[in-house]
């Protein structure tokens, strides 16, 4: 087993995850089996209870693990499926060590950071890295070198370096800020590497984030002061799309240097990623789409395009590449649609998407958008909460069930959405939802069946509430169809006769991959293409820049 450890310096948010995923993709292109581990130094057990305002989306793995969004990038770039064990947190490590101490497994020893915490970190890394027949394991250490939270993990990496001598490679991601006169400053990188050395670690390669490509003199200066060959100073300049980053790093000589340093030889030359980017570059048409959510604006909100709805954005991109038309997303604050007529906001869009979410805030605005899509024949895709609200909207405005709602929001005369039976006695919030992969059976001849091309599917879930079985008959009697089911659980709803009205209780975006888009997202993009042609007679033309 060979390990590639990716650390970060200067500041957080430099793109360590994309750098690590890109390295993995490049090594996959050479024929190697690659896996990935994300270390998160926070004390939380997992990301399940973290606010999207602070942390971005919670990504769900096949086994129900609720993890950092970087693991979604690993799955998409490497086309693999990870487990909750691929996400190591301070909370998990300390919980395990404390449980062992309580069971008497340390035989009366004083339990300390070194060796007990660091040994547990290394045990987890070795155990996970050897599953699935992988040959190379990427390890991204979250946070920034120098953070107190990261110290035990960096010490574990130092120990691993000597225990796995010759089979471990350190990549340090730093920043070269640019002054107003265009000078690239190297001092932050120098100080970051100095701090890393004080912990007993020396980077084998430095990937320098910068606005424009690193100048030769900047590379030479970093190489001189940080004790790495100039070939190991890689320009990580800004790219307009994350899927170009592997090719950019390849052009910088990153793959060649890592393979030489780790005594690796090309086993094959895969071109599928190059072909993907070429297909993406060839797209000249676009469609317009409204994403109506609650994490799209406000002083607390991070950039929604990157964080809270990341997997949805990527799934739309995958579908767009396949369909030959790129969705242009407009981020609509659901609360705005509680004050403004939907017609004024939504009339020029080719499709409307309501994503997953929790809580009552913004729900009326979302349902106003759903009603507009249903009544005006605009393609609609609802995900998780977006399906529940579509059912509530239909119950109120088509079935005449006044006050129909979800028990999540309080008392209601018509609880068309209710708590799952197995959730009724649950009191602890963390890791207690219906999480991970579950199957569904699709009815032949339905839109769902046409989209998937099969009657049996598996998708990822993250929810506590479901359609109340007591209301299924009245809903279907009035024209709604539940075309996908798992026993008594309704997984997919559609409205026959509508150009495209599809909503699902699961999260199809989390199984979408570049070159293998999620079927519902691909169908949605195709429906938007048709809507654009009906509405204007043509699709938009992308504005190309030199």
UniProtKB/Swiss-Prot annotation:
Residues 1-264 are annotated as: Amidoligase domain. It is an enzyme of class 6 (ligase). It catalyses: UTP + L-glutamine + ATP + H2O = CTP + L-glutamate + ADP + phosphate + 2 H(+); L-glutamine + H2O = L-glutamate + NH4(+); UTP + NH4(+) + ATP = CTP + ADP + phosphate + 2 H(+). L-glutamine binds at residues 357, 385-388, 408, 464. CTP binds at residues 12, 147-149, 185-190, 221. Allosterically activated by GTP, when glutamine is the substrate; GTP has no effect on the reaction when ammonia is the substrate. The allosteric effector GTP functions by stabilizing the protein conformation that binds the tetrahedral intermediate(s) formed during glutamine hydrolysis. Inhibited by the product CTP, via allosteric rather than competitive inhibition. Mg(2+) binds at residues 70, 140. Coiled coil: none annotated. Its EC number is 6.3.4.2. Residues 298-534 form the Glutamine amidotransferase type-1 domain. Keywords: ATP-binding, Glutamine amidotransferase, Ligase, Magnesium, Metal-binding, Nucleotide-binding, Pyrimidine biosynthesis. The keyword Magnesium applies. The active site is at 384 (nucleophile), 507, 509. SUPFAM superfamilies: Class I glutamine amidotransferase-like (SSF52317), P-loop containing nucleoside triphosphate hydrolases (SSF52540). Pathway: Pyrimidine metabolism; CTP biosynthesis via de novo pathway; CTP from UDP: step 2/2. One of its GO terms (biological process) is 'de novo' CTP biosynthetic process. UTP binds at residues 12, 185-190, 221. Catalyzes the ATP-dependent amination of UTP to CTP with either L-glutamine or ammonia as the source of nitrogen. Regulates intracellular CTP levels through interactions with the four ribonucleotide triphosphates. Belongs to the CTP synthase family. CTPSs have evolved a hybrid strategy for distinguishing between UTP and CTP. The overlapping regions of the product feedback inhibitory and substrate sites recognize a common feature in both compounds, the triphosphate moiety. To differentiate isosteric substrate and product pyrimidine rings, an additional pocket far from the expected kinase/ligase catalytic site, specifically recognizes the cytosine and ribose portions of the product inhibitor. This is CTP synthase. The lineage of its organism: Archaea, Methanobacteriati, Methanobacteriota, Stenosarchaea group, Methanomicrobia. The gene is pyrG.
């Amino acid at each position: 087993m060979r390990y590639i450890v990716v650390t970060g310096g200067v500041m957080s948010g430099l793109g360590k995850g994309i750098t690590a995923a890109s390295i993995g993709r490049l090594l996959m292109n050479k024929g190697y089996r690659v896996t990935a581990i994300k270390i998160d130094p926070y004390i939380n057990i997992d990301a399940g209870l973290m606010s999207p305002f602070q942390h971005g989306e919670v990504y769900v793995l096949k086994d129900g693990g609720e993890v950092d969004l970087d693991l979604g990038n690993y799955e998409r770039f490497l086309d693999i499926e990870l487990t909750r064990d691929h996400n190591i947190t301070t909370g998990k490590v300390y919980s395990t060590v404390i449980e062992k101490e309580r069971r008497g497994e340390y035989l009366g020893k004083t339990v300390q950071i070194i060796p007990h915490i660091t040994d547990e970190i290394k045990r987890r890394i070795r155990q996970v890295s050897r599953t699935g027949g992988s040959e190379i394991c990427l390890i991204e250490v979250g946070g920034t070198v120098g953070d107190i939270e990261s110290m035990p993990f960096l010490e574990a990496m130092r120990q691993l370096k000597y225990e796995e001598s010759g089979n471990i490679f350190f990549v340090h991601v730093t920043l070269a800020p640019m002054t107003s006169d265009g000078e690239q400053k190297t001092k932050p990188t120098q100080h970051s590497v100095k701090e890393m050395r004080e912990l007993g670690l020396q980077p084998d390669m430095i990937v320098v984030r910068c606005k424009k490509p690193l100048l030769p003199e900047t590379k030479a200066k970093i190489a001189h002061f940080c004790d790495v060959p100039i070939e190991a100073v890689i320009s990580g300049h800004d790219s307009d799309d994350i899927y170009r980053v592997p090719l950019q790093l390849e052009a910088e000589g990153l793959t060649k240097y890592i393979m030489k340093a780790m005594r690796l030889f090309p086993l094959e030359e895969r071109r599928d990623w190059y072909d993907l980017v070429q297909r993406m570059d060839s797209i000249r048409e676009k469609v317009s789409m409204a994403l109506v959510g609650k994490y799209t604006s406000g002083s607390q909100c991070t950039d929604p395009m990157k964080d809270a709805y990341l997997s949805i954005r990527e799934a739309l991109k995958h579908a767009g590449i396949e369909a030959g038309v790129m969705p242009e997303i407009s981020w609509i604050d659901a609360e705005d649609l509680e004050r403004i007529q939907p017609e004024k906001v939504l009339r020029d869009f080719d499709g409307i998407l309501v994503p997953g979410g929790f809580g009552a805030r913004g729900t009326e605005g979302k349902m106003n958008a759903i009603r507009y899509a249903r009544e005006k024949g605009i393609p609609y895709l609802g995900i998780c909460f977006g399906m529940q609200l579509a059912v509530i909207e239909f119950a109120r405005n088509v079935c005449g069930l006044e006050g129909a709602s979800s028990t999540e929001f309080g008392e209601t005369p018509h609880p068309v959405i209710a708590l799952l039976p197995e959730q009724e006695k649950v009191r602890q919030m963390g890791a207690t939802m219906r999480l991970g992969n579950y199957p569904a059976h699709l009815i032949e001849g339905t839109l769902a069946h046409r989209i998937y091309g099969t009657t049996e599917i598996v998708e990822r879930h993250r929810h506590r509430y479901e359609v109340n079985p007591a209301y299924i008959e009245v809903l279907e009697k009035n024209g709604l169809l539940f075309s996908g089911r798992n026993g008594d659980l309704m997984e997919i709803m559609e409205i026959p006769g509508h150009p495209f009205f599809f909503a699902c209780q699961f999260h199809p975006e989390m199984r979408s991959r570049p070159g293998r888009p999620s079927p519902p997202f691909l169908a949605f993009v195709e429906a938007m293409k048709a809507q654009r042609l009906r509405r204007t007679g043509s699709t938009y033309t992308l504005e190309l820049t030199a």
